[in-house]
């Protein structure tokens, strides 16, 4: 039996690994730059998950966890109105760790939605309905906040897009993030 529950700070290392998988390693390496490794980026992400004031904070994360306490999935979400405030920790961390300034990064969300930043299920636990469970728990979180739930999906990931539509997300418009064409989808209240 797998449960969906609020993340804990002590789970930061695993949560960071799954966030990086959701971002994809090519994107993570781009953020780290040519003089740093994916392990360097993982260290930064782990610190950001441990922070309470980061978009990747454990406080913004739901985990799918097995009976043996293995984390097999994550969903990171936050109020879109808080993106710029929450992103400051990433901008500061990347500048300190990699000497790279991302303060001019485009916003991927705005006020008026609970934004799903990262969703990932461990490869060995896929095709069991865990992503759907994580999505449904996050949508419920949005309902409690009186916000629709939004996300960006890469146009090159039709399988994920099918899942989102199946759960009730609707197309809101085109977007771009990290050099990729994306679709903005939203699950109405």
Q: Model-found features: residue ranges?
A:
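A short helix-loop-beta-strand connector motif used in the catalytic cores of GNAT acetyltransferases and
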Residues: 48-63, 81-85, 115
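Conserved beta-strand in the GNAT
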Residues: 63, 70-79, 115, 120
């Amino acid at each position: 039996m797998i449960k969906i529950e609020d993340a804990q700070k002590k789970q930061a290392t695993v949560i960071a690994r799954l966030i990086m998988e959701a971002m994809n390693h090519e994107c993570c390496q781009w953020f780290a730059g040519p003089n740093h490794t994916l392990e360097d980026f993982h260290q930064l992400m782990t610190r950001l998950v441990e922070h309470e004031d980061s978009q990747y904070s454990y406080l913004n994360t739901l985990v799918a966890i097995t009976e043996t306490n293995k984390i097999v999935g994550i969903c990171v979400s936050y109020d879109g109105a808080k993106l710029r405030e929450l992103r400051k920790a990433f901008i500061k961390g990347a500048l300190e760790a990699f000497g790279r300034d991302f303060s001019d990064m485009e916003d991927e969300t705005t006020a008026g939605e609970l934004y799903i930043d990262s969703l990932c299920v461990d490869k060995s636990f896929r095709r069991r309905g865990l992503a759907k469970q994580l999505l449904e728990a996050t949508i419920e979180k949005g309902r409690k906040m009186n916000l629709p739930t939004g996300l960006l999906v890469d146009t090159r990931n039709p399988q994920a897009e099918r899942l989102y539509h199946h759960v009730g997300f609707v197309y809101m418009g085109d977007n771009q993030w990290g050099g990729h064409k994306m679709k903005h989808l939203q699950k109405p209240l």
